[in-house]
Amino acid sequence: MSSGRIVQIIGAVIDVEFPREAVPKVYDALSVDGTETTLEVQQQLGDGVVRTIAMGSTEGLKRGLGVTDNGEPIQVPVGTKTLGRIMDVLGRPIDEAGPIGEEERMPIHRAAPTYADQAATNELLETGIKVIDLVCPFAKGGKVGLFGGAGVGKTVNMMELIRNIAIEHSGFSVFAGVGERTREGNDFYHEMKDSNVLDKVSLVYGQMNEPPGNRLRVALTGLTMAEKFRDEGRDVLFFVDNIYRYTLAGTEVSALLGRMPSAVGYQPTLAEEMGVLQERITSTKTGSITSVQAVYVPADDLTDPSPATTFAHLDSTVSLSRDIASKGIYPAIDPLDSTSRQLDPLVIGQEHYDIARGVQTVLQRFKELKDIIAILGMDELSEDDKLIVSRARKIERYLSQPFFVAEVFTGSPGKYVSLKDTLAGFKGILGGDYDHIPEQDFYMKGSIDEVIEAYNKRSK
């Protein structure tokens, strides 16, 4: 273990001078003497100087302070001892519940599984959310992205998915909070505690107020914990909220390291950094990682380089729409914009495929008719088109659903709808079985039985 000293501090970037024969390797962890600050080597500048990123605040550091090379990358605790605990980017507990007591630590930088080790599956993962199970079903061991602008419900959807899948699915989950609000992290912890699933979830937080080094590496910390569970032969759920903040932290670090920015000011290594993370989130022959990632879309522009780069790595994309949210339909998922590789008759079966495509066809036709309705009014439509509009409005409302995690805000109990009930409901609407029921009875209901019950109660 060699020793050096700090020669320059610029925000979160610190230059450290070492003897020329003992320069640390890139990604080695360094400890600043007399503090709890850890640095990670990013560049070797020559003459024994390395440029590092601080994993934590640089307040109180000054030139001349001694630094020790740990000789290895950042190591974090892994295994079952991490379950039920909240940790920071270095794997230190931040929940005031004593030491982790881990039996093993692993480096956060690892190679992705080789092509020969990877394994794909077509097994579906039921979420209990109608619109997702219908038009963009999730695969076990697949990658899912929740795309949406500010305030359309990414985190609420993520929390509902965690609640539904973590409770129905008996395996372990890892949640990485990357650059999100501390309040949301706190809410999430208590939500897990109240649902009695905290002992199956490892939580890793690097929140908005943390330096860019923490936000850049916290996703890798969470992923390392998930990889350990997978390599033990388990099926793991890995949740990331928010992958955009990971990119943003990379942009901040890149600028501080003096790299020339590329399109829209992002780092020139955007695709590579995203690939390094995403290629490790994969299923092997020993176990699977099913990942759900929230992706913030800046200014609702899906062509922005950050969400556009993320798209390439996903199996299912769930797109949240501000227009749907403005109608008061939650979850505000756009069934015409959301896609899944699983939406294939060979995977989900012909009946499910036909119902999903039927729903999308009716909604697409309704979208085309909106301009005519706005100019000429409903009366000018043919009888067939009037029927399509009527069914489309019912489908739109029936795609809404009360969430368990939103009970405290809405006052209405959450609903978990099985795939069988979801398909039966939409098949009935498309077949005209419920043409006599007014559209308001379809709003915020679970299964179709609740719609019929509400109609019968009102018509008495």
Swiss-Prot record:
Q: Which InterPro entries match?
A: AAA+_ATPase, ATP-synt_VA_C, ATP_synth_F1_bsu, ATPase_a/bsu_AS, ATPase_alpha/beta_chains, ATPase_F1/V1/A1_a/bsu_N, ATPase_F1/V1/A1_a/bsu_N_sf, ATPase_F1/V1/A1_a/bsu_nucl-bd
Briefly, what is this protein's role?
Produces ATP from ADP in the presence of a proton gradient across the membrane. The catalytic sites are hosted primarily by the beta subunits.
Q: Which organism is it from?
A: Alcanivorax borkumensis (strain ATCC 700651 / DSM 11573 / NCIMB 13689 / SK2)
Q: Which residues bind ATP?
A: 148-155
Q: List the disulfide bonds.
A: none
The membrane topology noted for this protein in its Swiss-Prot or TrEMBL record is: Peripheral membrane protein
The protein's UniProt keywords, in alphabetical order, are: ATP synthesis, ATP-binding, Cell inner membrane, Cell membrane, CF(1), Hydrogen ion transport, Ion transport, Membrane, Nucleotide-binding, Translocase, Transport
The UniProt family comment states: Belongs to the ATPase alpha/beta chains family.
NCBIfam families per the UniProt record, alphabetical:
atpD
Offer a single GO CC term for the protein. Answer: plasma membrane
Recorded catalytic activity of this chain's protein: ATP + H2O + 4 H(+)(in) = ADP + phosphate + 5 H(+)(out)
**Which GO terms label this protein's molecular function in UniProt?**
ATP binding; ATP hydrolysis activity; proton-transporting ATP synthase activity, rotational mechanism
Give compartment(s): Cell inner membrane
Q: How does it assemble?
A: F-type ATPases have 2 components, CF(1) - the catalytic core - and CF(0) - the membrane proton channel. CF(1) has five subunits: alpha(3), beta(3), gamma(1), delta(1), epsilon(1). CF(0) has three main subunits: a(1), b(2) and c(9-12). The alpha and beta chains form an alternating ring which encloses part of the gamma chain. CF(1) is attached to CF(0) by a central stalk formed by the gamma and epsilon chains, while a peripheral stalk is formed by the delta and b chains.
Coarsely, its chief localization is: membrane
Which EC class is this protein assigned? translocase
Instruction: Report the Pfam families cross-referenced here.
Output: ATP-synt_ab (PF00006), ATP-synt_ab_N (PF02874), ATP-synt_VA_C (PF22919)
Q: Which gene encodes it?
A: atpD
> So what EC number does this one have?
7.1.2.2
Q: What is this protein called?
A: ATP synthase subunit beta
